[in-house]
Every structure is written in structure tokens, then in C-alpha cells.
């Protein structure tokens, strides 16, 4: 009974943080709508960029969050080793992807319609890499049953984002869409700092067999995730 109550409490905290986060994010829509000039693309620039980021985030994490839970709870492997291997794979892929994109930033930005402002794309690529890497420590927090820190960091991101957006777009009457992406970058970095204790638990222990097993399990989740995002933003 005690375990059931604990599970219900943890689930409520995770769910509440998600609901509150989405609710607070709605406050940003009218701020962007009324502050961003139509000549610069307005709020559409932000929605387009975030749709791309959402899709790429699913690709870069390739179902490894679920894979981590599966293998950490299975009991056949050391959970800390599973965590380290998961973080190594997602972190390695994300950093390589980021490096390649930054090297070819200008042509990629041109193809995507951001040729005049490649730094928009550059900032969001850094955000994308950080968010992908953060996914594993957040999954680790859930595995360790630490819902307060999990929810606290998620809400910290939202509150800092809203505060900075209000400061720039409402108080300072700013209208540069690039600042919205810069704020997102700042917030993601703040969350990275909050996850430092979890990153310190990483140990470099590449295990090819474990990697193959986890990838085999996670690949179908990647396909479902991509399909879900395409259906959501399509």
C-alpha cells in the first residue's frame, strides 16, 4: 500500500509539472503574437522552428529514454552502467550532429529559409543538442524516484522563460524574434547546470553488446515517435 501511494504521488507530481508547464507556455503566445512584427515572419517563425526542433529531438534521442527504463529496471545490467551507456550514445550522436550542422550552418539555414538570420538556427541547434542530452538525466531522475527535482527543473525552465520574455517583449517593448530563441538557449543552459550532479554520475564504459541490445529495443520507439510528431505538427 505504501509503495502504491508513493507511486501515485510521484505520478501526480510528474503530471502536474507537465500540465502547469503547458498552461504557462500559453501565456507566451499572445506576447509573441502582439510583439513580433509581421515583416519578420511574426510568431510563425517561432512555431516553424519549434516544429523542426521537436522532430529532430525525437530522432536524436532515438527512443533511448524508454530503452534506459527497460534495461535499468530489467535487472540484468547495472543501472548506472545502463545510464552511462545511454548518455554516451545520445550525447555522442547529439554533439556530432551539432558540430556538423554548425560547420554547414549557412547553407543549411539558407535551405530552411533562415538565410538572413543563420544565428536563429544556430542557437536552436545548440538548444536541440542540450535538450537531447538532458533527456537521459531526466529519465535517470525518474528511475531514482526523484520527482521533486524532475518537476522543479522543468518548471524552472518555464518560469525563467516567461520572466525573460515578459522583460524583453513587454517591459522593454522588444520585437526581435531572435531574442526568443536566445531566451530558450539561456533556459536550457540553466537546466543543464541543475543536472550537473546527474552528469557527474556518468562513467565512460562503452559496452557494444549492451548498446546493440538497447538500440534494437529502442528503434521501434523512434519510428513511433517520429510518426507521432509528424501527425502532431502536420
Protein language model features and the residues they cover:
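Signature of the first transmembrane helix
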Residues: 6-65, 94, 98-102, 162, ...
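Membrane-interface helix-loop junctions in multi-pass transport and translocation proteins
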Residues: 31-43, 144-149, 158-191
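Interhelical loop/hinge segments that connect adjacent transmembrane helices in multipass membrane
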Residues: 1-7, 148, 152, 177-182, ...
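Transmembrane-helix boundary and interhelical linker motifs in polytopic inner-membrane proteins
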Residues: 2-5, 33-43, 56-90, 140-149
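Alpha-helical transmembrane segments of multi-pass membrane proteins
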Residues: 55, 91, 99, 113-134, ...
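Hydrophobic transmembrane alpha-helices of multi-pass small-molecule transporters
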Residues: 22, 26, 55-58, 98, ...
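Residue-level recognition of transmembrane alpha-helices
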Residues: 14, 18, 47-50, 90, ...
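Short membrane-interface helical motifs at transmembrane helix boundaries
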Residues: 96-114
Amino acid at each position: 500500500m505504501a509503495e502504491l501511494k508513493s507511486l501515485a504521488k510521484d505520478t501526480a507530481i510528474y503530471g502536474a509539472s507537465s500540465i502547469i508547464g503547458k498552461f504557462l507556455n500559453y501565456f507566451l503566445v499572445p506576447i509573441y503574437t502582439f510583439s513580433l512584427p509581421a515583416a519578420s515572419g511574426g510568431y510563425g517563425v517561432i512555431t516553424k522552428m519549434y516544429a523542426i526542433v521537436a522532430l529532430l529531438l525525437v530522432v536524436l534521442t532515438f527512443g533511448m529514454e524508454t530503452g534506459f527504463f527497460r534495461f535499468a529496471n530489467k535487472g540484468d545490467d547495472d543501472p548506472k552502467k545502463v545510464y552511462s551507456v545511454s548518455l554516451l550514445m545520445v550525447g555522442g550522436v547529439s554533439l556530432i550532429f551539432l558540430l556538423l550542422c554548425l560547420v554547414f550552418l549557412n547553407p543549411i539555414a539558407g535551405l530552411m529559409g533562415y538565410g538572413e538570420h543563420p544565428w536563429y538556427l544556430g542557437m536552436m541547434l545548440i538548444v536541440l543538442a542540450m535538450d537531447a542530452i538532458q533527456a537521459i538525466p531526466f529519465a535517470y531522475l525518474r528511475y531514482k524516484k526523484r520527482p521533486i527535482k524532475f518537476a522543479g527543473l522543468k518548471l524552472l525552465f518555464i518560469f525563467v522563460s516567461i520572466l525573460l520574455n515578459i522583460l524583453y517583449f513587454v517591459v522593454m517593448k522588444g520585437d526581435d524574434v531572435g531574442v526568443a530563441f536566445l531566451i530558450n538557449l539561456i533556459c536550457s543552459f540553466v537546466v543543464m547546470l541543475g543536472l550537473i550532479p546527474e552528469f557527474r554520475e556518468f562513467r565512460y564504459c562503452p559496452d557494444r553488446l549492451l548498446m546493440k541490445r538497447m538500440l534494437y529495443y529502442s528503434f521501434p520507439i523512434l519510428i513511433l515517435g517520429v510518426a507521432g510528431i509528424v501527425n502532431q505538427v502536420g
